[in-house]
């Protein structure tokens, strides 16, 4: 991204202490003017900066998109250098015990939100000297992380949609990067804790109820949001951009296993990590 022109970055989901918050700060430190979105009820004092414009946006609401784009065009003059599809929510549960209504909500934010934003903003990215779309994905979209089947599915969908988007936008000079994120110390898991997420009493996984509870309440060994954001912002400004950018704790390990080992390596690992062998013979 060359000098001499104001650069604009739009980041969705910029709640206090999360990846979006850290990205907003780091983009500003690198000379960008940032447009940060929040839900109407969220505090915004953490985003008080002359170069950060805060706009209310629920990425699941189609009727908010046209007014949002108009406001965005007024700020940027009609172009957009970087779109970061960061807004996301999490839901922890076994695949068999999944509440589909919860999953529908998660897909609405994690998958349909990015689709909606690209649909409405792609011309602004094309109009920029070098438009970049960044999708905040996850290692969960690559490996079968136990108790995360539905979240994993949203990220796998985002990755594959992003892959096709990358190919389709290339003729217009717009780059698309999927970030394959490892563990980052954010608030995304707190909704499970707040909702006191537990296994159903009649679940076939009931023998693992305590392990599930401990998993929900865990404190991951995670990269800080600021370290994560610095890596992403530096990557966005490279001359040559990757299709996938693996970033965050455990990504090197996950990449190695996914690249060089049989697919069933995950079965072996996760069965042992989550003590699934303890379920053998408990039904029937």
Swiss-Prot record:
Classification via InterPro entries: NAD(P)-bd_dom_sf (IPR036291), Sc_DH/Rdtase_CS (IPR020904), SDR_fam (IPR002347)
Pathway: Polyketide biosynthesis
The enzyme's E.C. designation: 1.1.1.-
Active site: 151, 155
Binding site for NADP(+): 11, 37, 58, 86, 151, 155, 184, 186
A Gene Ontology molecular function term of the record: acylglycerone-phosphate reductase (NADP+) activity
GO BP field: phosphatidic acid biosynthetic process; triglyceride catabolic process
Protein keywords: NADP, Oxidoreductase
Coiled coil start-end: none
Induction entry: Expression is increased in rice-extract medium (REM) and is correlated with the production of pyriculol.
Cellular-component GO terms for this entry: endoplasmic reticulum; lipid droplet
Pfam families (UniProt xref): adh_short (PF00106)
Family: Belongs to the short-chain dehydrogenases/reductases (SDR) family.
Record function comment: Short-chain dehydrogenase; part of the gene cluster that mediates the biosynthesis of pyriculol and pyriculariol, two heptaketides that induce lesion formation upon application on rice leaves but are dispensable for pathogenicity. The highly reducing polyketide synthase synthesizes the heptaketide backbone of pyriculol and pyriculariol. Pyriculol and pyriculariol contain several hydroxyl moieties and double bonds, so it can be assumed that several reduction steps occur during biosynthesis.
Name of the featured protein: Short-chain dehydrogenase RED1
Species of provenance: Pyricularia oryzae (strain 70-15 / ATCC MYA-4617 / FGSC 8958)
């Amino acid at each position: 991204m060359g000098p001499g022109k104001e650069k604009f970055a739009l980041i969705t989901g910029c709640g206090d202490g999360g990846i979006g918050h850290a990205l907003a700060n780091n983009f500003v430190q690198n000379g960008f003017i940032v447009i940060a979105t929040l839900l109407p009820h969220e505090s915004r004092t953490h985003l008080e900066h002359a170069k950060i414009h805060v706009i209310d946006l629920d990425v699941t609401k189609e009727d908010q998109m046209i007014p949002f784009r108009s406001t965005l065009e007024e700020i940027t003059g009609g172009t957009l250098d970087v779109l970061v599809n960061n807004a996301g929510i999490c839901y922890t549960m076994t695949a068999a015990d999944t509440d589909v209504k919860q999953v529908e909500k998660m897909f609405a934010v994690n998958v349909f939100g990015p689709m909606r934003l690209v649909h409405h903003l792609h011309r602004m990215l094309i109009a920029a000297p070098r438009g970049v779309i960044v999708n905040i994905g996850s290692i969960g979209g690559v490996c079968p992380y136990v108790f995360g089947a539905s979240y994993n599915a949203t990220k796998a969908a985002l990755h594959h949609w992003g892959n096709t988007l990358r190919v389709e936008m290339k003729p217009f000079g717009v780059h698309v990067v999927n970030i394959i994120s490892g563990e980052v110390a954010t608030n995304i898991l707190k909704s499970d804790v707040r909702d006191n997420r537990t296994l159903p009493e009649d679940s076939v996984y009931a023998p693992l109820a305590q392990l599930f509870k401990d998993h929900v309440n865990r404190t991951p060994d995670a990269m800080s949001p600021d370290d994560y954001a610095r890596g992403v912002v530096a990557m966005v400004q490279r001359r040559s951009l990757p299709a996938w950018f693996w970033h965050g704790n455990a990504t090197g390990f996950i990449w190695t296993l996914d690249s060089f080992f049989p697919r069933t390596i995950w079965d072996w690992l996760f069965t042992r990590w989550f003590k699934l062998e303890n379920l053998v013979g408990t039904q029937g």
